[in-house]
Amino acid sequence: MFWKFDLHSSSHIDTLLEREDVTLKELMDEEDVLQECKAQNRKLIEFLLKAECLEDLVSFIIEEPPQDMDEKIRYKYPNISCELLTSDVSQMNDRLGEDESLLMKLYSFLLNDSPLNPLLASFFSKVLSILISRKPEQIVDFLKKKHDFVDLIIKHIGTSAIMDLLLRLLTCIEPPQPRQDVLNWLNEEKIIQRLVEIVHPSQEEDRHSNASQSLCEIVRLSRDQMLQIQNSTEPDPLLATLEKQEIIEQLLSNIFHKEKNESAIVSAIQILLTLLETRRPTFEGHIEICPPGMSHSACSVNKSVLEAIRGRLGSFHELLLEPPKKSVMKTTWGVLDPPVGNTRLNVIRLISSLLQTNTSSINGDLMELNSIGVILNMFFKYTWNNFLHTQVEICIALILASPFENTENATITDQDSTGDNLLLKHLFQKCQLIERILEAWEMNEKKQAEGGRRHGYMGHLTRIANCIVHSTDKGPNSALVQQLIKDLPDEVRERWETFCTSSLGETNKRNTVDLVTTCHIHSSSDDEIDFKETGFSQDSSLQQAFSDYQMQQMTSNFIDQFGFNDEKFADQDDIGNVSFDRVSDINFTLNTNESGNIALFEACCKERIQQFDDGGSDEEDIWEEKHIAFTPESQRRSSSGSTDSEESTDSEEEDGAKQDLFEPSSANTEDKMEVDLSEPPNWSANFDVPMETTHGAPLDSVGSDVWSTEEPMPTKETGWASFSEFTSSLSTKDSLRSNSPVEMETSTEPMDPLTPSAAALAVQPEAAGSVAMEASSDGEEDAESTDKVTETVMNGGMKETLSLTVDAKTETAVFKSEEGKLSTSQDAACKDAEECPETAEAKCAAPRPPSSSPEQRTGQPSAPGDTSVNGPV
């Protein structure tokens, strides 16, 4: 509806573009210019692709706006120009990448003096980055021609946007070969050496930080690329250059030259920490990141890096003792003089990374310098510095979990470990770790007893104590730790054992989260039986709680089904009794023992299931009760052999006349069929009882009770067919409906002898008598053999035997002559009726027994009609 009436607001840009004197600024003043550009507005893109427009857009980006402009709109046009050029329109990217004059104009921004405008630098970096991503070959070729490009990048590295541009140049090129060419080109330009030179105390802090971050990102990107492309034949040239020993020595020489500059030291340590990221398992809880199929050479630390760092361990140790001067810091806890500082914190991080490599030579140097003792003193001195406490805890855990000797880095020096963990002995004996823990714990308890505050490192101290206990029980150094504890003085050992069983145990018990016995959450009032209280003690409850957690029933016991016990909702047992909309989907399992009766009934059911075309009755109920008429094939079929089952009308349904047209004489114990028409929508048939085909039954059993499923009383066994009582039940308005798959007249209802139907069904008295005698004489044979159903009729002066067969095309059961030569038409039957009108009149005058149909019970005359038995097969 919104688009139908054209209620959407049209863009004003199209109106502006129709003017010949429209300017670029007028278009940029429109609010929806960016949306129209990204929506590929053809007129707008054609306008922007003009040479003067592209040149103006680039000029807005690289030129400083006037100082006298309002600050709110000063950078409006540069911002919109950047967004238009980076809207990723292929036509604009192609024009910028192919026009060298525009590229040169854009490149001229780097020629400005430092520092660059950070906002304009971000616009420039964004435009050039998308050009590198979309047109890598053209842009890289253009930059290679500019011999001062790397110099300008180094010159403006203090601007974060320029640092981002350098990283974009390394990451935006996806094809392997062009990327390798860029790496080789940058390595030839000595980008690594130039960045390392920037990390110098004489440089500014921003340049320190950006140069360090650039080198760290180069290391990470190169290693990630090596993990992704394992089959790469060429190593990353930038990473190989940075890992050289002389480059690391140059970096360390810069930061320790003359004065101590915290910014330069921290930036250099950040580079070293990135190079020491081994990504290998260290102590319990750490997971190996190196892929299984990847050799550890790609994940391990380069030997040259460790050798270069080892030569400067003394300088780093001096930083722990005498850091760069810092002013006194006042905190809520007290006065820090001097504070820990970023320098010493990063030095401790570097020591923890070196301990992770587990290099025997570096471990020996750390023991000689007593660096572990220094950082342990800092742990207890600075009570509230959790960054420091975390790093000290990691160092102690690494020492406790490190194996005896380093097998991978054993070739670094000639001195290998002797199989004895000297650093672990140093931690227990010289650093006196156990004594320091006990003293700090007792001091904290004494302070808390006096009403003081708990020390801030107590949580980390608890974890360190638990790590020692864990290393005593299991781990690569369990035997050595047990021996070191035994070698303690008796007093200290007893205090330690008492501490582990009392203070440490109680603390662990308080810190343990109770998973079972607290705060049961019940979903309803009926859940008490599902959540019963545990009967075991709390001390040994963890394993039992986990076992019960695995075995418990996670959901409540719900009833299987939800429903309503109301009459308007069907029960489960009544589903089979509802009316079906698709009758053709119903399948019956029929008993195949009585082939003759089954064939007859199948024919009736198949005829019933067909949708009758009654020429106007579209809403006829196909399950409405109708009368059944059985006539021989000679009276039903024409000489052509076609059936007329679909030529009926709906007059019978309109006047509501329902009358049964056949009457079984007697009940035969062998041949009986019982059908109940009392409930047409859900009628059922009983095939276990033989079909009734004999005479003698009263007429009131025919009608609504014909389909009854009740067991009839057995009667005298006689012949199943008697044609001496032929009458017609067809009227003029029912003549077209008298054709069913099998018709057999058994009713004695009176009829009009002058109607065409009566003439068609009347037979000569002699023929009728002969048929009756023949049927009576053959009654016993029919009772004995029910597999073959036959009929004997008099056709003219000849006797003819008809057998019940099923037509393969129409699937209807019909009586056919055994010789297959003679076929009696309705015209011949009409001729016989004209020759013997007395017989017809005599039959019409025969008394009619009371009927059970509604019309006969009310005393009103009912129109004769037939009932076609429809039912699914």
Curated annotation (Swiss-Prot):
Compositionally skewed regions (Polar residues) per UniProt: 724-749, 853-873
Chain residue ranges for the region called Disordered: 628-873
Residues annotated as transmembrane: none
Residues modified as Phosphothreonine: 631
Function (record text): Regulatory subunit of protein phosphatase 6 (PP6). May function as a scaffolding PP6 subunit. May have an important role in maintaining immune self-tolerance.
One of the record's GO molecular function terms: protein phosphatase binding
Pfam families associated with the record: SAPS
Location of Phosphoserine modifications: 315, 579, 617, 634, 722, 853
Entries under InterPro entries matching the protein: ARM-type_fold, SAPS
Assigned protein family: Belongs to the SAPS family.
Keyword entries, A-Z: Cytoplasm, Nucleus, Phosphoprotein
Organism of provenance: Homo sapiens (Human)
Subunit composition and interactions: Protein phosphatase 6 (PP6) holoenzyme is proposed to be a heterotrimeric complex formed by the catalytic subunit, a SAPS domain-containing subunit (PP6R) and an ankyrin repeat-domain containing regulatory subunit (ARS). Interacts with PPP6C and ANKRD28.
Localization in the cell: Cytoplasm; Nucleus
Keyword Endoplasmic reticulum among record annotations: no
SUPFAM superfamilies assigned: ARM repeat
Entry annotated with the keyword Transmembrane: no
Protein name: Serine/threonine-protein phosphatase 6 regulatory subunit 3
CC per GO annotation: cytosol; nucleoplasm; nucleus; plasma membrane
Domain of life: Eukaryota
GO biological process, any: regulation of signal transduction
Tissues expressing this chain: Expressed in skeletal muscle, placenta, heart, pancreas, testis, brain, lung, liver, kidney, spleen, thymus, prostate, small intestine, colon and leukocytes.
